[in-house]
């Protein structure tokens, strides 16, 4: 995947995460702040940071619950070396339902 393709997929994914949280967080318990390639989610558990790392072609997640992760885009999913999926971690920790493959 070239840099342009990576940027488009990563930016679409990060925007999708922000959108899904805003749609499903009916109590407005998560403060969503999307600034460029960086998404901050301020929750009662702490602050999550999700950002695009262009040089590594990864999305990085910093979770106040489970720590840091680096995800690569392979076979239509953002997964880390241990096989964990970005959307699965966010679903579990934020109680927001995400599709595996955002459009």
Curated annotation (Swiss-Prot):
The keyword Kinase does not apply. This is Iron-sulfur cluster assembly protein CyaY. NCBIfam families: FeS_CyaY (TIGR03421). Involved in iron-sulfur (Fe-S) cluster assembly. May act as a regulator of Fe-S biogenesis. The keyword Isomerase does not apply. Keywords: Iron, Metal-binding. GO terms for molecular function: 2 iron, 2 sulfur cluster binding; ferric iron binding; ferrous iron binding; ferroxidase activity; iron chaperone activity. It holds the Pfam family Frataxin_Cyay. HAMAP family: CyaY (MF_00142). One of its GO terms (cellular component) is cytoplasm. InterPro entries: CyaY (IPR047584), Frataxin/CyaY (IPR002908), Frataxin/CyaY_sf (IPR036524), Frataxin_CS (IPR020895). Belongs to the frataxin family. It comes from Rickettsia peacockii (strain Rustic). One of its GO terms (biological process) is iron-sulfur cluster assembly. PROSITE patterns: FRATAXIN_1, FRATAXIN_2.
């Amino acid at each position: 995947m070239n840099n342009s393709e990576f940027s488009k997929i990563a930016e679409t994914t990060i925007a999708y995460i922000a959108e899904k949280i805003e749609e499903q967080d009916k109590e407005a318990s998560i403060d969503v702040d999307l600034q460029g390639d960086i998404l901050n989610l301020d929750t009662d558990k702490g602050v999550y940071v999700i950002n695009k790392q262009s040089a590594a072609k990864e999305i990085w997640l910093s979770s106040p619950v489970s720590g840091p992760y680096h995800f690569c885009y392979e076979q239509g999913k953002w997964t880390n070396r241990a096989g964990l999926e970005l959307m699965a971690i966010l679903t579990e920790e934020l109680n927001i339902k995400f599709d595996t493959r955002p459009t």
